[in-house]
Amino acid sequence: MNFKKLMASAMVCAFALTGCGSNTATTSEDKDTFVVGMECAYAPFNWQTSEKTDTSVKLGKSGYADGYDVQIAKKIAKKLGKKLVIKKTAWDGLIPALEGDEIDAIIAGMTKDKTR
């Protein structure tokens, strides 16, 4: 799969999932932030690193998040005029975090199936 198709697919998933949250700010952050949940363990899409790079985003006190998904999240946050916050979340915790207003979106290569 070429890079353009990959990025297009990631954008579609990201925009589709941003509408799944509520209209209120998340409980974990204020309304000036865009909180995105991802595993940070699936390179090259998203991963955790201890080193800051030109493309990484601070990941709490535990280093930095980087990857294609992080870049998509940065573009969405910029378009929304909000500060990006990446919340490292286990795969099984992503949907509950979204439904519980802990995050605003999931950007993690998640596809639709019967349970979602």
Place the predicted regions along the sequence by residue:
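Short, low-complexity disordered leader/linker segments with a strong preference
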Residues: 1-33
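Extracytoplasmic small-molecule ligand-binding "clamshell" domains
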Residues: 30-109
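Short, intrinsically disordered, charge-balanced linker/junction segments flanking boundaries
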Residues: 111-116
